[in-house]
């Protein structure tokens, strides 16, 4: 079994790659050193490099994302907007497009790492929230476009990486009393990779956060 993980050197992506390897997958963990997938040619090259190294492709996990710093919507710049959509939405589209033929051949799976910020409005993370919402729609678009040979699913984690002074607050927003971990996301990836009758849907991995009051959403 052969997997490409974009954002594979980040905290969440590396946990996904490590878990897949532990389960016997051959993994190509793509990071910035392999190219900026916000660039179309770089995105295609990353896929080709992975296919050449692995001998094919059974799973694409798109975990690449931006590192947006929260700010009021009045202060968001064009550069902020472009950076948010670059690796997340644009990169997700063109990496999946490039991988599609290989995944059709293997009957493979695409898993988009979305975010609960793409399912609810977070004003202080406007570009990131909008980019993740776009990625959520791409999950559905590709599920229809690549069926029946390829399944496409999404995972929307709640807060996973937070500042130490915010951990208690974020944990209180979860019904389970803690924030998520990269391993929680990796568990969901393994489930969806083997869930043969699941496609076109997003699995929310947030400890029940979305069931809490919308008043907890920061402004």
Role assignments for model-derived ranges:
Residues 9, 17:
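N-terminal Rossmann NAD(P)H-binding glycine-rich loop of SDR-like oxidoreductase domains
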Residues 56, 136, 146-160, 198-205:
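Conserved Rossmann-fold SDR core element
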Residues 63-69, 207-208:
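Conserved NAD(P)H cofactor-binding loop of Rossmann-fold oxidoreductase domains
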Residues 71-73, 80-82, 170:
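Substrate-binding pocket helix/loop in short-chain dehydrogenase/reductase
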Residues 96, 131, 139:
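Active-site helix of classical SDR
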Residues 101, 143-148:
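Alpha-helical segment proximal to the catalytic Tyr-Lys
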Residues 182-205, 210:
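C-terminal substrate-recognition "lid" of short-chain dehydrogenase/reductases
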């Amino acid at each position: 079994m052969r997997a490409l993980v974009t954002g594979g050197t980040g905290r969440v992506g590396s946990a996904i790659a490590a878990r897949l390897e532990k389960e016997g997958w051959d993994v190509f963990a793509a990071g910035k050193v392999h190219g900026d997938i916000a660039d179309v040619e770089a995105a295609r090259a990353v896929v080709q490099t992975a296919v050449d190294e692995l001998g094919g492709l059974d799973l694409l996990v798109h975990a690449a994302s931006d590192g947006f710093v929260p700010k009021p919507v009045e202060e968001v710049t064009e550069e902020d907007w472009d950076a948010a959509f670059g690796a997340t939405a644009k990169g997700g589209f063109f990496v999946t497009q490039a991988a599609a033929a290989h995944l059709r051949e293997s009957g493979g799976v695409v898993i988009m790492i979305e975010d609960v910020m793409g399912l609810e409005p977070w004003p202080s993370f406007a570009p990131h929230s909008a980019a993740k919402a776009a990625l959520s729609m791409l999950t559905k678009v590709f599920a229809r476009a690549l069926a029946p040979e390829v399944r496409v699913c999404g995972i929307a984690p709640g807060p996973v990486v937070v500042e130490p002074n915010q951990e208690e607050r974020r944990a209180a927003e979860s019904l389970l009393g803690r924030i998520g971990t990269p391993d929680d996301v990796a568990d969901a990836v393994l489930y969806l990779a083997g869930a043969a009758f699941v496609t076109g849907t997003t699995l929310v991995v947030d400890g029940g956060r979305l069931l809490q009051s919308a008043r907890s959403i920061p402004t």
